[in-house]
A protein has these predicted regions:
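Surface-exposed, low-complexity loop segments enriched in small/polar and acidic residues
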Residues: 55-73, 84, 94-133, 139, ...
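Short loop/turn motifs that connect adjacent beta-strands in outer-membrane beta-barrel proteins
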Residues: 40-43, 147-150, 246-253, 341-354, ...
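Outer-membrane beta-barrel translocator/receptor signature
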Residues: 1-60, 64-66, 132-138, 149-150, ...
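C-terminal beta-signal and adjacent terminal beta-strands/loops
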Residues: 562, 655-658, 706-718, 745-800
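Residues that define the transmembrane beta-barrel architecture of outer-membrane proteins
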Residues: 25-31, 132-136, 235-237, 328-332, ...
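C-terminal beta-signal and terminal closure region of outer-membrane beta-barrel proteins
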Residues: 267, 275, 456, 469, ...
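Gram-negative outer-membrane beta-barrel transporters
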Residues: 551-715
Length: 800
């Protein structure tokens, strides 16, 4: 059901269609088959499987809360916004103001103007909230025991998935043109322009006579051609072959090799060619009508008047792109396990001896990516700039050892005291070497309770994608305006702006970032080092004999992370550069070298803030995990004839989630907060609680309560770096969300089972968030929450 009346009230003024009050969509279908058989001699077994999954898409425009991009002004006034890359023109030198096409004239652009295309483009009408996908998997697990020394095993799996992605139409995007300023050149004697249009963009009589060109930033959607479509296909293979068994005495071995391969085919369809757009805008009057200056098969592109675009022009401009890639992994691992009690190696106070395991692993991973010529050249308008070819590998060799040492057993107040030790040495081909280890202790004073504590020092080396993902330029709402450009809502001083790479003449004359989004460079960094983590935990498990059926555990943990792989928050880069002029920050601001703009879509052309992966600062996360399982003794109240009832609770309390963005910076704590720097929703408490009733009538009913606690906006706090102490009138707090799921299973007989249920039965919408705060790629909220609403399902199982 559509029941967000607040967002619905914003749709009308922007001429956005309201979704149907009741919508059924997002259907999915699943099929799985499992077959198993034993060999005649009883020493082998094979289990084979096949699965099929098909998911129908859901458009963002089919939910009222996501039907448009909700933005909120500083005064707390909400409205439906969108991209001015719809019908907005202005000179690349910033002179002359913003214009829109109406009829065959330029008029001053207005956010509320009635133009076609409209002043703001609503991309949500085209984009998916849930993508379409089709997936097949198949494989087998096999084993055969030749004898006690050779127990052979093998796994094989195959997966194919195909996804169609739709996003808003391509077009001409401000800052994506081929001119030195990343604009498009429009010749003043273009016959499609009226006299008023020539005057509006600053063409003089001599300019018209000589055919001079004006460098323009043009935002104009290809509404005539429809949305862009992306097709992705992955094929995945994994094979494992190994042997395990006895060596001699207490010693056993396990040796295996595995190979993993995933291929990618990607097609980008219904795009326009940037180079052809430029050709089609350079038009003069020929003997039989307007013709392109470039000649050849070029067809003039008339975007200077409403209804001027022809199908012939669209056919000329159309371009598709394809790319292929693959990721592979090879592993060889061997280990030996032994119980040293046979040699008398044990504690004098324990019954069991020391158990050890040691071994090695070699692993090699390879990444390759090959775009076609169109994507290599960056000619697809709206595709994020030029792609690059990748052919990179990582290799690692590791040796490890573990020991389990029972210290005390079966004595008063020490039923079991066990020490676990582990060590691993890793040598990466990227130059990283690491010694990691763990120490853990368990103590069970009585059978009813077991205490545990552990300390681990570990690393996470950067993976192939973090190292070698191609760098590209895209839009970001983390920095929604350039404080040194025209019309900045909070302009910085000239002295501060000089730090960011502008000239005094450019101050407040630079074109402003369109659509409330400046540009960011994202991608890999081959110079990354490993993350280092130190983890401490302490907890207990309670299984009281005086309360049969109860199992409860509680664990406190703290994780200290250094050298986190991520990016410096873009707002921090801009603010620190303005305030300090520190080159560590200012060098990350790469302006367009011609006009100083901070937007574009090409790495070489500049106009972005560097948000590529780096090893940034440090952080600490601590909290408490809680698990409770209880089989209720309903027989004690005379209900034994009604089956069994069980309750399970899994919860987490977040004590702190601190971040030090850069060495020497003050830390800020995101526990209980959300926002651009905290990046996601960090509730202090969340849980899932499930109650199962297993009846004596071959039916089981289940109710689950999913809870996400309240969070506050980071800027409304006094946290260093991220807090301002102000109160946001719209998003001060995101209230707690509770979801109720109901399901049931009916075992009709030994062969047939039916299951059905409803998730989010109360149809809770996600909380509404200013889209310039969320910055998640989703409209107006975070993916932490349930996005689709009430979901019903039914399934059928047959065992033969």
């Amino acid at each position: 059901n559509q029941h967000n009346e607040f967002v619905q009230s914003l749709l009308g003024p922007r001429q956005v269609a309201k979704p149907k009050e009741n919508t059924w969509d997002g259907a999915s279908r699943d099929l799985s088959i499992v077959y198993g058989a034993n060999t005649e001699d009883g020493r082998g077994n094979v289990t084979a499987f096949f699965t099929y999954h098909d998911q129908e898409p859901v458009l963002q425009g089919k939910r009222d809360w996501s039907a448009c991009q909700v933005v909120v002004s500083g005064a707390g006034v909400a409205s439906c916004a969108g991209s001015p890359n719809s019908n907005q023109w202005f000179r690349a030198d910033g002179q002359g103001g913003q214009l829109a096409v109406v009829g065959n004239e330029f008029v001053p652009w207005s956010a509320t103007g009635a133009t076609s295309p409209p002043p703001f483009f609503n991309s949500n009408e085209y984009s998916y909230l849930m993508q379409q996908s089709t997936r097949y998997t198949a494989g087998f697990f096999a084993k055969y025991d030749v004898n006690d020394h050779f127990k052979l095993y093998s796994d094989f799996s195959f997966m194919n998935d195909r996804t169609n992605v739709q996003i808003a139409p391509t077009g001409l995007f401000q800052g994506s043109g081929p001119s030195p300023t990343s604009g498009f050149l429009v010749n003043c004697n273009n016959p499609f322009m009226s006299g008023g249009q020539r005057t509006a963009i600053g063409c003089s009589a001599d300019d018209i006579l000589n055919g001079e060109s004006v460098d323009m930033y043009i935002g104009r959607r290809n509404i005539e051609g429809g949305g862009r479509v992306g097709f992705y296909e992955h094929q995945n293979y994994r094979v494992v072959m190994g042997s395990r068994g006895d060596i001699v005495g207490p010693w056993k071995y396990d040796l295996y090799g595995s190979y993993y391969y995933t291929s990618l085919y990607q097609a980008s369809q219904n795009y326009l060619s940037i180079s052809k757009i430029q050709n089609a805008l350079q038009v003069v009057q020929g003997p039989n009508g307007p013709v392109c200056i470039s000649g050849g098969d070029c067809v003039p592109y008339n975007i200077f008047q409403q209804g001027g675009v022809t199908n012939e022009a669209l056919s000329y401009l159309a371009i598709n792109g394809t790319s292929r890639g693959a990721v592979s992994q090879r592993i060889v691992e061997g280990s030996v396990t032994g119980d040293l009690s046979e040699y008398g190696v044990k504690s004098p106070w324990a019954n069991d001896g020391v158990a050890v395991n040691f071994g090695f692993q070699t692993r090699r991973e390879h990444l390759e990516y090959t775009p076609d010529v169109a994507q290599l050249s960056g000619d697809l308008s709206g595709a994020g700039g030029a792609s690059v070819t990748i052919d990179e590998s990582i290799a690692v060799t590791e040796g490890f050892g573990e020991a389990r040492i029972p210290l005390i057993q079966d004595v008063a107040w020490a039923q079991d005291v066990v020490l676990d030790l582990g060590y691993r040495y890793s040598d990466y081909s990227t130059g990283i070497t690491a010694d990691t280890y763990k120490v853990a202790l368990q103590w069970a004073p009585i059978d009813d309770i077991r205490f545990r504590t552990s300390y681990n020092q570990a690393i996470r080396a950067p993976n192939l994608l973090e190292l070698y993902t191609p760098q590209s330029v895209t839009n970001t709402s983390q920095v929604s305006s350039d404080p040194c450009a025209q019309g900045a809502p909070s302009p910085a001083s000239l002295a501060a702006c000089l730090n960011t790479g502008i000239t005094a003449a450019q101050y407040q004359n630079i074109p402003q970032c369109p659509s409330g989004q400046c540009s960011v460079l994202t991608g890999g960094n081959p110079d990354l080092m490993s993350e280092e983590a130190k983890t401490f935990s302490i907890g207990f498990t309670l299984t009281p004999t005086f309360l049969n059926g109860l199992t409860a555990s509680l664990d406190y943990f703290t994780i200290d992370l250094e050298g986190t792989i991520g990016n410096i928050p873009l707002g921090v880069i801009m603010q620190r550069c303005l305030e300090t002029g520190d080159d560590a920050f200012c060098s990350q601001i790469v302006r367009n070298p011609v006009n100083g703009a901070l937007f574009g879509d090409d790495v070489a052309a500049g106009g972005y803030i560097n948000g590529a992966n780096v090893n940034v600062g440090a952080g600490t996360t601590s909290g408490v995990d809680v698990q409770v399982n209880y089989n209720l003794p309903i027989e004690m109240i005379g209900l034994e004839d009604y089956g069994r009832v069980s309750v399970a609770l899994n919860g987490a309390y977040l004590i702190e989630a601190t971040t030090i963005p850069l060495p020497g910076d003050p830390e800020y704590d995101c526990a209980g907060l959300f926002g651009p720097q905290c990046q996601t929703v960090n509730p202090k408490w969340r849980h899932q609680m499930r109650v199962n009733w297993t009846t004596p009538w071959d039916m089981t009913f289940s109710a689950a309560w999913r809870y996400i606690g309240e969070v506050k906006l980071e800027t409304d706090t006094q946290e260093p770096t991220i807090g301002t102490g102000a109160t946001n009138p719209f998003n001060h707090t995101l209230p707690a969300r509770s979801y109720l799921d109901l399901s049931g299973v009916w075992n009709i007989n030994d062969t047939f089972t039916v299951r059905a249920g409803v998730n989010n039965i109360l149809d809770q919408d996600p909380p509404l968030v200013n889209s310039r705060i969320a910055g998640t790629g989703l409209p107006n909220t975070y993916p932490t929450y349930d996005l689709l609403g009430r979901k019903m399902f039914i399934g059928f199982t047959a065992n033969f």
